[in-house]
């Protein structure tokens, strides 16, 4: 009889534990719907304190922790420039930090000095008239993990179906929501100085390769040159990405369904703004945007998940 009671107690505790875990996952956003739309940005122009990172996105957790420890009440922000499935992990670039001010408000000199004391740099991002955006609950650390596996595939599908030129990918942690934002215009204004510097370096390498090829009088580039062009961040296929704060690891691990194309590439025929039904218009948005507002020198991109990546899920 005592054995039956013991087994019943163990079974009851196990069931209670499973129900608790399910409730925790549900509270973290497991069952939350993901709606992607195009419209006004979730934030206005902002001034941020950031640190530039080149390397594994999973190593950015310390940057979130550092920026939050300086001023815990400020919102965290991340701008991911490279697709980790296209660019070598040690070459992926991002900027992580805190939002110091928004709109017409200017950050206090004391706050700027405080962040600069810890090695952060200050930069301002504009408020683009239109963006591709999505939100996800931010209630627990698990919310971050769930968001990277649910929101990014939804963004990929939305952008791919409409052949949009939307990059880089930003994440803003605001109260109990994670806002994902992909600008449809003024993308170059979201490139911090370090990002622009690496872009010019890689672009110079590509131009040097072109010069060498032209010097040989060849009509077409060799296979080696073609590969170099395709994988060079800042040339045809390279630029932008995304992730989060908290103590857990950040970045896109090998298990998600990310495409092999970079953020700054949207295929040869990206759709214009006139072909896009913009939703969620607000005071920050405009009715239509001139498709010619894309920054000079950027290329469009299109997400195309590959079979090997799907097999890793």
Swiss-Prot record:
Residues 1-6 are lumenal. The keyword Transcription does not apply. It is found in: Endoplasmic reticulum membrane; Cytoplasmic vesicle, Autophagosome; Cytoplasm, Cytosol; Nucleus. Residues 219-247 have a biased composition (Polar residues). A motif (LIR motif) lies at residues 273-276. Residues 264-273 have a biased composition (Low complexity). Residues 32-313 are cytoplasmic. The keyword Plastid does not apply. GO terms for molecular function: signaling receptor activity. This is Testis-expressed protein 264.
């Amino acid at each position: 009889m005592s054995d039956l009671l013991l087994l019943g107690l163990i079974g009851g505790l196990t069931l209670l534990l499973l129900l608790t875990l399910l409730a925790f996952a549900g509270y973290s956003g497991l069952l939350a719907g993901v709606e992607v739309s195009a419209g006004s940005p979730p934030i206005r122009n902002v001034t941020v304190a950031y640190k530039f990172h080149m390397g594994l996105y999973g190593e950015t957790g310390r940057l979130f922790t550092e920026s939050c420890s300086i001023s815990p009440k400020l919102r965290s922000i991340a701008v991911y420039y490279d697709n980790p499935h296209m660019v070598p992990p040690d070459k992926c670039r991002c900027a992580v930090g805190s939002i110091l001010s928004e709109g017409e408000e200017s950050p206090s000199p004391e706050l700027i000095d405080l962040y600069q004391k810890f090695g952060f740099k200050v930069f301002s991002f504009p408020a683009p008239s239109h963006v591709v955006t999505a939100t996800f609950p931010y209630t627990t650390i698990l919310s971050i993990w769930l968001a990277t596996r649910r929101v990014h595939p939804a963004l990929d599908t939305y952008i791919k179906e409409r052949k949009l030129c939307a990059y880089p990918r930003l994440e803003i942690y605001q109260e109990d929501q994670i806002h994902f934002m992909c600008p449809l215009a003024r993308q170059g204004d979201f490139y911090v100085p370090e990002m622009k510097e690496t872009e010019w370096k890689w672009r110079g390498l590509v131009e040097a390769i072109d010069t060498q090829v032209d010097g040989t009088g060849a009509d077409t580039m060799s296979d080696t040159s073609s590969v170099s062009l395709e994988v060079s961040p800042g040339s045809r296929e390279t630029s932008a990405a995304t992730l989060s704060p908290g103590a857990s690891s950040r970045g896109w691990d090998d298990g998600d369904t990310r495409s092999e194309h970079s953020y700054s590439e949207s295929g040869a025929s990206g759709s214009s703004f006139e072909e896009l039904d913009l939703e969620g218009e607000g005071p920050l948005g405009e009715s239509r945007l001139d498709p010619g507002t894309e920054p000079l020198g950027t290329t469009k991109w299109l997400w195309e998940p590959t079979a090997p990546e799907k097999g890793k899920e």
